Amino acid sequence: MYAVAVIGGGVSGLSCALTLADGAKRFDFAKGKKFLVVDSGSSDALKAVLNNVPGVKRGTTGEEYLSFLRAQVEEFEDVNLVEGEVCEVVKEGERFKVILSDGREFEAELVVFATGFHSFPVKTELVEVVPHLKSPRPGKIALKPKAEGVFVCGNAAGEITMVATAAGSGVSVACDILSRWAGKVVVPHDSIG
């Protein structure tokens, strides 16, 4: 069983997984935890050219950026990156079951939806679909958690639709989860020296 299942392998989902995996290496309370990322390969970032993302060379394609993020996540053996489409997520007792369209099933203690803002075809009662109020385009959606242990990040959380805010949202959710496990506010800062 996984500690966290991240549904969505775009910028926010990968940023969340990266921060969780890094935290699991740094903090005793998170050591040994395993993480799942399910990626349908449909991130909007795949169509982007990045010109205003802090720390990213101007003109970097979204595909290049996602490949870089994915490679960073793959450095952590505690993260399982799975390609597929999630069709259903249910809560069974204290656990969540993530069901893919090909029949594979995974269990996790917590679930993070990082599914974008176009549509939400996942069958679940764990989130409410609401209008995305910060999208420059009409008809986009956001998700509101309805159950304990459910988190939402990136565009799905109603964030401004930019790569930098999506990454920050994923990192913020990961810090919330790490803090939950620690019983206090925790931030996995990098240090010099």
Segments (PLM) and residue ranges:
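Beta1-alpha1 glycine-rich phosphate/pyrophosphate-binding loop at the start
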Residues: 4-64
